[in-house]
């Protein structure tokens, strides 16, 4: 999945499907029909086809206007009926009103169906992303996924609401106009059409060039989007490191590369575009000349027929000149379709046949694991047993494999060897949703959404009552903080909970975990963001939360896990030792060192209220 990794490749054909033959507009339109059938309900499909039908009715009305104009050229000057001009004008007004009705209905129905299609494609993609393993998700580019869910799906909406119906109308209009031209004079029609065929060959070259330009644009836009995401996510570090100028320069380079590449591609296509528009005009001129050369022949057209022919020739210019913008959108749609297909092609996490376990002991048998692309094992030959209802703490120096071990226990990654059993069965034999319903996770990096406090809490239990929310919040020592917010539990949080402090976000996540009431609990640095006073209160909440649950805890502050049933001491991906706090203090030198460092950090963590400020 090269195109969805974090690596950059500025090639138009990069990506999962890039090496395949690029489809033409007809395949793209058929692909749209498949999307409509796949994602839209029968009712919305009927809405879309009704919109397309109204669009065709509008085209018929346009042709009727041309027919009335042609009839007026032939008959108005020869008729003595004074009412004929009024009748002609009345018919034109009626056609205008009909066109207004057809256009309004077409736009309404096509827009409803198009936005419905966009919603369903986005929903389908999100469901597919959710069904991927965490390891797979982490290997994808957040910027490119965001671009696909926004811009690429938007082009699908545009294609269904505007481009495909417009192409159908223009093809119909050109067909009817040339049929009329052939009926009046096949020489005029054939001459104009012959010149136009040359333009069609050039149009093929233009389509190929546009496709190349827009694929390159899409690749580089994805890189720019990725840079924006990285810039936003690393803003606090960038400012703290005074690296704003460096990052801005890098971002400017990305934008400049996009500008230069796109401008170069556009400049290369300008000669072909200009030639195509010239040929369109030339086809009209050649048709008129063909009629003029036959002016004195026995088969010459009458003056009124010549005027009608000229009118029809000029009428061909409107749909022909509209082809290039439609090809542009169609090419963008195909790029978007490729990106959507690439996400859909990413394998989802395999789900086993077993429902939720009825026992919650965890057995780890000789597991090893290396991150993709690395040869150094992150976890090597680790074995232990955690009885149901026990508390297991995982400690060790930075980089020792604590979090990786927890991720493996959560089935985020596939093991290289060994097995992990939950309730006597391999964790991979459980249905994915059943497994995640069994466990609750509180990570060091808390995930909060741009929604109300109550809705963020209800991610743990969608059916939780207000009373249950408040009880969980009190256990996590966050209720008073929530009530101090402007709208209490109905207060909207900023992006990633930006209106709360780090400790408050952590406690909100703990309250959410309390609500879920899963039998297996994972706490990754659960109290790392809390001050000493709140840490004691949270510890009391954990005592009630963890009753009769199988609990795994990772913590820097070793004082929070001294009462754990067992402590796993990790070092360089291996299990150095395991036991209770007292047992490890008596025999494990690494744990002794970690404990001494912890005590030293606690001793030096003070406030100095009486210390004078430095001037």
Regions found by a protein language model. Name each.
Residues 1-62, 83-88, 106, 110, ...:
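Membrane-integrated ABC transporters
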Residues 38-46, 134, 151-160, 164, ...:
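An intracellular "coupling" helix at the cytosolic face of ABC transporter transmembrane type-1 domains
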Residues 45-65, 71-119, 138, 304, ...:
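Transmembrane-helix motif of ABC transporter permease domains
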Residues 60-71, 98, 164-207, 263-308:
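A hydrophobic transmembrane-helix motif
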Residues 123, 421, 429, 454-495, ...:
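ABC ATPase nucleotide-binding domain helical subdomain, centered on the C-loop/LSGGQ "ABC signature"
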Residues 243, 267, 316-343, 352:
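Cytosolic ends of transmembrane helices, especially the final helix of ABC transmembrane type-1 domains
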Residues 410:
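Helix-to-loop junction immediately C-terminal to a conserved catalytic motif
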Residues 437-445, 456, 472-476, 490-589:
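ABC-family ATPase nucleotide-binding domain "signature/switch" substructure
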